[in-house]
A protein has these predicted regions:
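Conserved PLP-enzyme active-site core in the AAT-like
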Residues: 2, 6-7, 11-14, 22-23, ...
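Short glycine-rich or small-residue beta-strand-to-loop segments that form or flank ligand, phosphate
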Residues: 14, 18, 45-48, 282-287
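Long amphipathic N-terminal alpha/beta scaffold segment
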Residues: 18-22, 26-44, 56
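A generic structural signal for short, non-catalytic loop/turn and secondary-structure boundary residues
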Residues: 39-40, 95-100, 277, 345
Length: 386
């Protein structure tokens, strides 16, 4: 990160606010060069006008697919909020409504790629392959950059011109390499996750091949305008500072995830990944098999928060999901999942997904508070930790 900032001559002038059209915004343009350099892409789009990770993914998909094209997922069903973007669940403005078809190949029971059926699924209309790095609300392992590279190589050998896009949410700075370094054409993510370092108040990014990024820019703004417009308003310094802090913040979040895995594995719960496995994102899944324990866990995470610690999280019908979802996130930035947070759908197997913590110490406190809530309700036997 430091090298990328130095090579692209980041200066104090880059932190100046722009408004209106945002023409000649030095800070915005330089930041996009920093992202491209750091993630090894030809170009980047890093904007506060991209509201969340789902928005960034929808933008990347809709700008690089045309009616008659087919989108294919070789790693099973995508994250819940993308179902309406794609049209798996009907929604206005979906890809399906614009004549883009969708196919998917599920992972094999052992979590490996089903290469035989992936080969069968690729056809003349397959324009873009989407690879979700993180597990989402599933209980499969997160994909390593190495495995993603192997999958992309297999796909490109079958159809060299297919666009391979990686949903990089929760994975930035966890490994030494990023997906663009192993053959991906685009990586997409959110600034209120890893790369924002807990300081970015909003935003998303798309980094990769120049043509793919340009297509996304024209979709975000307007044909003919592209990257030339889009004021950075007053958030640009937090984008830079958050990106600078991101590797350290991610490191603390990883320590918290490992701690959670070890604690809950000793208590007899199923955890993915376990306490000794390699990490490829910041998410720790714990399966409780009942809603009471799942809700108590989230209440403990909320009670450890610096913001809204007095609030009791409750399941609700969150937009984009097909079941009630509970979310614990006493965060400075609403919905920030690089801050201490936990969430999950209230449905079997009642798995909760823990992530974040701007410091390792805060992540540790959150886990201990979650344990306290479970103990108070006799939902766990803490003697197993002795």
């Amino acid at each position: 990160v430091i090298k990328a900032m130095q090579e692209n001559r980041v200066s104090a002038e880059c932190f100046n606010m722009s408004s209106g059209y945002g023409y000649n915004d030095l800070g915005r343009d330089t930041l996009e060069k920093v992202y491209a350099s750091c993630f090894k892409g030809e170009d980047a789009l890093v904007r506060p006008q991209i509201t969340c990770g789902t928005h960034a993914l929808a933008l990347a998909l809709m700008s690089n697919l045309r009616p008659g094209d087919e989108l294919m997922s070789p790693v099973g069903k995508p994250y819940d909020t993308l179902e309406e973007v794609i049209g798996i669940r009907p929604s206005k403005g979906s890809l399906a409504e614009y004549g883009v078809t969708y196919s998917q190949v599920d992972l094999l029971p052992d979590g490996s790629f089903d290469y035989e059926n992936i080969k069968k699924a690729i056809n003349d209309r397959t324009k873009l392959v989407t690879i979700q790095r993180s597990k989402g609300y599933a209980t499969r392992p997160t994909l390593s950059v190495t495995r993603i590279g192997e999958l992309i190589s297999f796909i490109k050998n079958i159809k060299p011109d297919v666009i391979c896009m990686v949903d990089n949410c929760y994975g930035e700075f966890v490994e030494e390499k990023e997906p663009l370094e192993v053959g991906a054409d685009m990586i997409v993510g959110s600034l209120i996750k890893n790369p924002g370092g807990g300081l970015a108040p909003i935003g998303g990014y798309i980094v990769g091949k120049k043509e793919c990024v340009e297509n996304a820019a024209y979709r975000l703004t307007s044909p003919g305008l592209g990257k030339e417009v889009g004021a950075s308003l007053g958030v640009i310094q937090s984008f830079y500072q958050g990106f600078f802090m991101a590797p350290t913040v991610v490191s603390g979040a990883l320590k918290g995830a490992v701690f959670a895995a070890n604690i809950y594995e000793k208590l007899g719960f199923s955890v993915i990944p376990n306490g000794t496995e390699s990490r490829h994102d910041i998410i720790q899944a714990v399966t409780f098999n009942n809603s009471d324990a799942m809700i108590a866990f989230c209440e403990g995470i909320q009670a450890a928060a610096p913001v809204d610690s007095y609030v009791t999280p409750e399941p609700w019908a969150m937009p984009g999901y097909d079941s009630d979802v509970i979310m614990a996130a006493g965060a400075f930035v609403q919905g920030s999942s690089i801050e201490l947070s936990a969430d999950g759908p209230i449905k079997p197997p009642y798995a909760v997904y823990f992530q974040g913590g701007l410091t390792w110490y805060h992540a540790k406190l959150g886990i201990l508070m979650s344990l306290q809530k479970l103990k108070e309700r006799n939902l766990v036997n803490t003697d197993l930790l002795c």
